[in-house]
């Protein structure tokens, strides 16, 4: 009897210690989990700014999807392609050119520019995750992540 209690107690300790690992990670209803993050595909089209705002309203810490690995990309493609078919979804990159330090080919610094007022945002293709620079005001589907 003592051995049974000892073994049962040991199994209980193992169960409790494992319950905090990724195996126990759970996303809210309607969200899919991958590598301790949650994702949801939305079939509404909106511009980039509205899409980012929309994501922040869906769950605490949620934003437009960002990628940390090619495996994560494959997971998101597996979720978007069946729902959205061949289309584009906004990802959490924008104003990429504003972050670059540009200079002329002769080495002088860029002091004057005539860029259009349109800022550029990045969308990914649902079929192969190629990234495309697009006008931020165009309407695309949304994938949120937290």
UniProtKB/Swiss-Prot annotation:
SMART domains the UniProt entry points to: CLECT (SM00034)
Query: What interactions and quaternary structure are annotated?
Result: Dimer and tetramer of heterodimers of alpha and beta subunits ((alphabeta)(2) and (alphabeta)(4)); disulfide-linked. These two multimeric forms are found.
> Is Glycoprotein set as a keyword in this record?
yes
Signal peptide start-end = 1-23
Q: Which PROSITE patterns match?
A: C_TYPE_LECTIN_1, C_TYPE_LECTIN_2
Other remarks?
Answer: Negative results: does not act by binding GPVI (GP6) and integrin alpha-2/beta-1 (ITGA2/ITGB1). Does not bind to platelet GPIX (GP9), GPIIb (ITGA2B), and GPIIIa (ITGB3).
A Pfam family for this UniProt protein?
Answer: Lectin_C
Tell me which residues make up the C-type lectin domain.
34-145
Q: Which domain of life is it from?
A: Eukaryota
| Disulfide bonding pattern of the chain | 27-38, 55-144, 121-136
| Localization annotation | Secreted
Q: Which Gene3D superfamilies match?
A: Mannose-Binding Protein A, subunit A
Database matches in InterPro entries = C-type_lectin-like, C-type_lectin-like/link_sf, C-type_lectin/snaclec_domain, C-type_lectin_CS, CTDL_fold
- The protein here is known as Snaclec mucetin subunit beta
Which UniProt keyword terms apply here?
Answer: Disulfide bond, Glycoprotein, Hemostasis impairing toxin, Platelet aggregation activating toxin, Secreted, Signal, Toxin
Q: Which family does it belong to?
A: Belongs to the snaclec family.
What this protein is reported to do is described as: Potent platelet activator that acts via GPIb (GP1BA/GP1BB). After activation by the toxin, the receptor is redistributed on platelet surface thanks to cytoskeletal translocation. The indirect activation of integrin alpha-IIb/beta-3 (ITGA2B/ITGB3) also induced by the toxin is downstream the cytoskeletal translocation of GPIb.
Give the tissue specificity: Expressed by the venom gland.
Per the record, GO CC terms? extracellular region
Under Gene Ontology molecular function, one entry of this record is: toxin activity
Per the UniProt record, which residue ranges are transmembrane?
A: none
| Modifications the protein undergoes after translation, according to the UniProt entry | The complex is glycosylated.
């Amino acid at each position: 009897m003592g051995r049974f209690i000892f073994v049962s107690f040991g199994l209980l300790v193992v169960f409790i210690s494992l319950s905090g690992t990724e195996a126990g990670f759970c996303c809210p209803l309607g969200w899919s989990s991958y590598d301790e993050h949650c994702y949801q595909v939305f079939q509404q089209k909106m511009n980039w700014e509205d899409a980012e705002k929309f994501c922040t309203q869906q769950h605490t810490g949620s934003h437009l999807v960002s990628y940390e690995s090619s495996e994560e990309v494959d997971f998101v493609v597996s979720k978007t392609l069946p729902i959205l078919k061949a289309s584009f979804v906004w990802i959490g990159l924008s104003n990429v050119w504003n972050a670059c330090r540009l200079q002329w080919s002769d080495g002088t610094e860029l002091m004057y520019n005539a860029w259009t007022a349109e800022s550029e945002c990045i969308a990914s293709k649902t079929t192969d995750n190629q990234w495309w620079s697009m006008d931020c005001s165009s309407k695309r589907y949304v994938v949120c992540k937290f």
